């Protein structure tokens, strides 16, 4: 089932949230904005058949830059390359999806 892996920026703190939505990305941003005193905006995104797996892989990939939960202190280069990183991860998943040792449920 398709979903969107997103990178949302907290403009005041220059932190980025890596998350997933299966719905409308703009509605997700509005929901996150509620109760948040600083402006949030979409910095980058990737639509995928494997959004939850890619989100997990991204959290692992950027683990040294993790600040709190799903919020990360990413560089400009990380933000610019986000979609390419997601595409590489998606290709890895596709190569391994028939391997029974990789995962039981791919989505």
Task: Write out the residue ranges for each language-model feature.
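Non-catalytic accessory segments flanking enzymatic or RNA/DNA-binding domains
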Residues: 1-107
